[in-house]
Amino acid sequence: MKYGRTFNFSAGPAMMPEPVLEEIRDEMMNYRGSGMCVMEMSHRSKVFQQIADEAQADLRKLMNIPDNYKVLFIQGGGTLQFAMVAMNLMKNGKACYVETGAWSKKAIAEAKKYGEVQVVASSADKNFSYIPDCSDLDIPEDADYVYICENETINGTTWHKLPNTKGHVLVSDQSSMFLSRPCNVSDSGLIWAGVQKNVGPAGMAVVIIREDLIRDDLDPKTPIYMKYKTHADNDSMYNTPNCWAIYCCGKVFKYLLSIGGLEEMEKRNIAKAQVIYDFLDSSKLFKGAVVPQDRSLMNIPFVTGDKELDAAVVAASKEAGFDNLKGHKSVGGLRASVYNAMPIEGAQALVEFLTKFEAEHK
């Protein structure tokens, strides 16, 4: 690759589009005549305010976000949102969660600190290898919301059809599939995503929340930073935001618009994921970990069935110029994360490597 860069299959932080990195490089020392790097700017300056405004406007255009939704840029990444969602949305103290893998499990554990949590569906019975049927969930009338992790980064499943929430608010963690395909924002009351997988550097989450869900009647002990209203009322600048992440994400939003938006991005993602899945389906050594109908376009876990052989694949992949193919420590095996910025050439090169490895280990 250009600049001696590697095909980085990390689950996050992950690859960013090369044209975006080049533009950031060119603006590093003197952003548009300001005499300083964006990292050095006051978040109260007119120059940075324009950066933040453009980032929000471009994201709204990219996702066709309705006017009655607020876009918030909040520090703390994804894990903070496990708590913020529950603290802000549990008005009746009751919520429903669908358990589909490691990250929805973490969200459930955190939400239990703030109210009653009902797991209305789970795929734990088959090691989270599928998305459960959620067409007729048993949802209590007084449940405040239904929560899903729309793409499980570790387990490699994704929702291709959203659950029937029977009129209840849907909350979706889109972290590892954010901006990878079109979505109807109004299907959810709140969408959030840690940005370090598909759109920027670590340390920030994007929250898209319907205005009627922004409450002022929270528990008085709720930290002011943990209130969505604090961020909504101050246009994400109650305190110094993650200026660098906002700037970098804004660049990615513009890049996605320039290539044809999320429809084009989805086409590219389908094409490169299919390259890998086609190989796995025909391989006698490597096996995918997810049922075909629920496979993620972003995170592809697979195994040989032999831990020592899995480790040998990881070692050989590094020698071949690939990075981060080792599966998550909680599940082992192998995983290729092919986020938006991964070119199809990366998927093709990976399959070529795996094909050679299989031939050498018959």
What are the functions of these language-model segments?
Residues 195-277, 291, 360-362:
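Active-site C-terminal subdomain of aminotransferase-like
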Residues 286-317:
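Conserved PLP-binding catalytic core of the aspartate aminotransferase-like
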Residues 12, 111, 123-178:
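Active-site phosphate-binding strand-loop segment of PLP-dependent enzymes
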Residues 171, 185-196, 205:
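Conserved active-site segment immediately N-terminal to the catalytic lysine
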Residues 34-81, 88, 102, 110:
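Conserved N-terminal alpha-helix of the aminotransferase class I/II PLP-enzyme fold
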Residues 5-56:
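A glycine-/small-polar-enriched, mobile loop at the entrance of the PLP active site in fold-type I
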